Amino acid sequence: MLNEDSEWLDHVRKGNREFVELEQHHRRLERELNTLLKRRILPADDEVRKKTLQKEKLAAKDRMNEILRQSKLAETTH
């Protein structure tokens, strides 16, 4: 999901509850999206749901990346 080394991710997970919650939320969205994408034909309401899930998933990933950037910046300034 993220292009960070696992030790750094573990460090951030231990120190940032929001990151952990976002990571879990991102996984739930991924599972729900995959379930929708397995269907051959999506009714209009499922198409809307798919787009909503994709946007939420991207927003979660963007926020997680921002947390990682802030954490690295904080580490380098101390």
Segments (PLM) and residue ranges:
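Extended, charge-rich alpha-helical interface modules
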Residues: 1-78
